[in-house]
C-alpha cells in the first residue's frame, strides 16, 4: 500500500515517456537507498544498496520505497533503451516554491529557531545528516540530463555533518536561538561518501555553512508574507 503506488507511478511516467520516444530520464530518489547492511566506512553509488526487506522490517517504508523504485526504474530503462540518471539527495535547504513547503523539514524547524522557539530536537541527536542546497540539486539534475555520458546513480548532497556541528553553525547565524541539550557521549562519525561520480557532473555545490546561512536569511525575508504559512497552494 505504501511502496507500490510510488513504484508504479514512476514506471507509468517512464512508460509514457518511452511511448513518445523519450530516451533521457532523470529521477529523484534518496540517499536512504544506499545504506548497506553491514555499514561501510565510505559509501558509493555503484556498490552500495539498501536492503528493502530489512528497511520494511525496520518500518522504514518510505526508504524502502526509494530502493524498490530505483531497481524497477533501472530495469525498465535497460529494457527500453532509456538513459537513466538517478539523483540521491537527503536534507534539502534553500528557497522553496510553495507556502505549504514551509511546513516540512528543514524549513519548519528553522523557522521555529528563528522565532526563538524549540527547533527539531530537545537534545542533540548523536547522529549525522546529509545536506544540499536546492539550487545546487537542480543544477545536478540539469547536468545529468544534458550530459549524454551520464547515467546511473549520483549522490545529491554536499556532505554529512554531525548534528552538534549543525547546531553550532546555526548558533553563529542565530546567536539567541534556543539550543537543544548537548550530547553526553562521544559523537559518532558522520556518514562518509565517495563523491567522484557527483563531481563528474561538474556542479560546484555550496558548503554547509553557506547553505545554512542562505536558508535562514531567506526564511527571515518572509518570502510568503502575502500568504499565511500553512495555507496549501
Give residue ranges: language-model regions.
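Substrate-positioning beta->alpha
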Residues: 105, 122-143
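Mid/C-terminal beta-alpha module of Rossmann-like enzyme folds, strongest
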Residues: 128, 138-187, 215-219, 223-233
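Conserved sequence/active-site signature of Rossmann-fold short-chain dehydrogenase/reductase
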Residues: 33-34, 92-94, 137
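Glycine/proline-rich active-site loop of Rossmann-fold NAD(P)-dependent oxidoreductases
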Residues: 79-82, 94-110, 143-154
